[in-house]
């Protein structure tokens, strides 16, 4: 091991990028910085009412540069010279179109303000019809079912659906793009100066979970499948977009001299391969096989790794993919998740906060006080409900406010609130929201277990997991499992730093690096036996409402409405 070696993990989230410097020997988190995307904060290029969420590539470039420079500036000179690697994770699927030089189209003047030329954020659901078309073709019998290793359902949140939607909608982008790239693959390519689309290393994680890549059909689906889906996919796009994939501990190259100078780090820094945030966060959390890791934020991503021998040739239905090496080499990475978790709470806060916002407009002198009240709304709701957590009249809420990711992805679904009466107050309704997110978490756990994939432990990480013990206790009671809370609140960036340590040769493999660098457990929550029984009844009612409500959002039903 290199004495004093330091790696930097870059974690690209929905709102911001985090840079974290980690000591590769002790695992000590040395310095960190978070930078919010400026254009995103202004709401540019997004239309929430139409489910359109886009990120301009300059938001990523400017923010990563600022974050790393701040982190590096806080290190000693010796520490700066000891930086030997950078690892990258990002949200996903978050792809963007690129030209022959590997440049994101939005970085060209003629596309600078075109949302279709930017990164299509994971939670963008403009491609629902395109996802339906992919699913229909996979089930038509004309081709093998290319969805069988991704749970049997292709989502509008994923790679090909988004490519197809933009290609159909925007002829200029369609003609200019020769390929598309995931954010987690683009950042290492950018920093290492890899430009030609054919030379860019594509990560196993993103390719296997979102791009229909699988060894059994030698990579991506064949060209005739894409042509049958829509000829626009074969007009100008290179085929195949890529063939080989790499696990994230593999190096993709060294940082360019220009970027090393801009960031103030050595030119010898190695770039690790990219992967999705939650898969990388699982490594940062130190997870072992058959531990269900819940990465909880605006949404959740649930990751479990399993032995290749145990999964064998079985396919696990209703999840978001089973990919060899997507988390740790030589293990199958299984992905699931909820399309909204913290976003549901935030929506409820905005709903109640509307009157405060209006009052601030009418009384500017009270604006600061009213904004402070609004910022405390969810905290007070949670505290109030926790003091009197009645379950006798708890509303049943379906956690589909941003569609459903697992089990069985369906982004047509909408949130549902039931069992209200004239006595339902705001804290009680918020309690229903908390229970709904916990019910969704249990449905994911059962999706694994009912198909013979054991869940031996449950870990939770992220801001909500560490800062909201009330919410986590509800999850514990609903799932009727001990719930371990991971100590680090930046596990994704930590995991990226772990991958960088292996890529740079500091550690020989991921398990060894985890022993030195992974986070510990902060505390373990235990189920309350009395509340477990009552939540069981409520969960059964939640499942009943799920069965009743889902048909109302079928394509034929929504068309009639």
UniProtKB/Swiss-Prot annotation:
User: Per the record, what are the reactions this protein catalyses?
Assistant: D-ribulose + ATP = D-ribulose 5-phosphate + ADP + H(+); L-ribulose + ATP = L-ribulose 5-phosphate + ADP + H(+)
What InterPro entries would the database entry show?
ATPase_NBD, Carb_kinase_FGGY, FGGY_C, Ribulokinase
Gene Ontology terms for molecular function:
ATP binding; D-ribulokinase activity; ribulokinase activity
Q: What pathway is it annotated to?
A: Carbohydrate degradation; L-arabinose degradation via L-ribulose; D-xylulose 5-phosphate from L-arabinose (bacterial route): step 2/3
The answer to whether keyword ATP-binding applies is yes
Q: Which SUPFAM superfamilies match?
A: Actin-like ATPase domain
Family assignment from sequence similarity: Belongs to the ribulokinase family.
Q: What name appears for this protein in its UniProt entry? A: Ribulokinase
Q: Which organism is it from?
A: Pectobacterium atrosepticum (strain SCRI 1043 / ATCC BAA-672)
Q: By which gene is this protein encoded?
A: araB
């Amino acid at each position: 091991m290199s004495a004093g070696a330091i790696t930097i993990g870059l974690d690209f989230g929905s709102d911001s990028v985090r840079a974290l410097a980690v000591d590769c020997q002790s695992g000590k988190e040395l310095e960190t910085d978070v930078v919010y995307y400026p254009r995103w904060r202004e709401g540019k290029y997004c239309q929430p009412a139409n489910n359109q969420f886009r990120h301009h590539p300059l938001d990523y470039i400017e923010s990563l540069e600022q974050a790393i420079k701040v982190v590096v500036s806080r290190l000693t000179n010796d520490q700066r010279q000891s930086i030997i690697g950078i690892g990258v994770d990002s949200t996903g699927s978050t792809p963007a179109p690129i030209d022959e030089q590997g440049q994101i189209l939005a970085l060209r003047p003629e596309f600078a303000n075109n949302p279709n030329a930017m990164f299509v954020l994971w939670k963008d659901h403009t491609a629902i019809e395109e996802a339906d078309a992919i699913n229909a073709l996979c089930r038509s019998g004309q081709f093998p079912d290319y969805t069988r290793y991704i749970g049997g359902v292709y989502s509008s949140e994923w790679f090909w659906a988004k490519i197809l939607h933009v290609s159909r909608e925007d002829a200029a982008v369609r003609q200019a793009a020769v390929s598309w790239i995931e954010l987690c693959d683009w950042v290492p390519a950018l920093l290492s100066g890899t430009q030609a689309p054919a030379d860019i290393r594509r990560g196993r994680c993103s390719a296997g979970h979102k791009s229909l890549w699988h060894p059994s059909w030698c990579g991506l689906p064949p060209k005739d499948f894409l042509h049958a889906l829509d000829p626009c996919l074969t007009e100008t796009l290179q085929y195949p977009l890529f063939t080989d994939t790499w696990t994230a501990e593999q190096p993709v190259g060294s940082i360019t001299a220009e970027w090393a100078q801009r960031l103030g780090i050595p030119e010898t820094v190695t770039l690790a391969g990219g992967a999705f945030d939650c898969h990388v966060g699982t490594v940062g959390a130190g997870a072992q096989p058959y531990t269900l890791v819940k990465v909880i934020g605006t949404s959740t991503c649930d990751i479990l790794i399993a032995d290749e021998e145990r999964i064998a040739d079985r396919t696990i239905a209703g999840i978001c993919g089973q990919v060899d090496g997507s988390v740790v080499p030589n293990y199958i990475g299984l992905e699931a998740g909820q399309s909204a978790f913290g976003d549901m709470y935030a929506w409820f806060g905005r709903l109640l906060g509307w009157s405060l916002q209006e009052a601030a407009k009418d009384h500017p002198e009270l604006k600061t006080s009213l904004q402070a009240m609004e910022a405390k709304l969810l905290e007070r709701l949670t505290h109030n409900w926790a003091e009197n957590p009645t379950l006798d009249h708890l509303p049943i809420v379906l956690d589909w406010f941003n569609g459903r990711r697992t089990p069985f992805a369906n982004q047509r679904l909408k949130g549902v609130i039931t069992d209200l009466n004239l006595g339902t107050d705001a804290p009680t309704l918020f309690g229903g929201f908390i229970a709904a997110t916990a019910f969704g978490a249990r449905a994911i756990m059962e999706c694994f277990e009912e198909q013979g994939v054991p869940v031996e432990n449950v870990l939770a990480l992220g801001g909500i997991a560490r800062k909201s013990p009330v919410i986590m206790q509800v999850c514990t009671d609903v799932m009727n499992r001990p719930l371990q809370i991971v100590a680090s609140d930046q596990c994704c960036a930590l995991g990226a730093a772990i991958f960088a340590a292996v890529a740079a040769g500091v550690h020989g493999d991921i398990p060894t690096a985890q022993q030195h660098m992974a986070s510990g457990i902060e505390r373990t929550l235990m189920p309350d036996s009395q509340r477990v029984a009552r939540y069981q009844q409520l969960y059964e009612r939640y499942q009943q409402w799920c069965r009743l409500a889902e048909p109302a959002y079928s394509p034929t039903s929504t068309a009639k409405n």
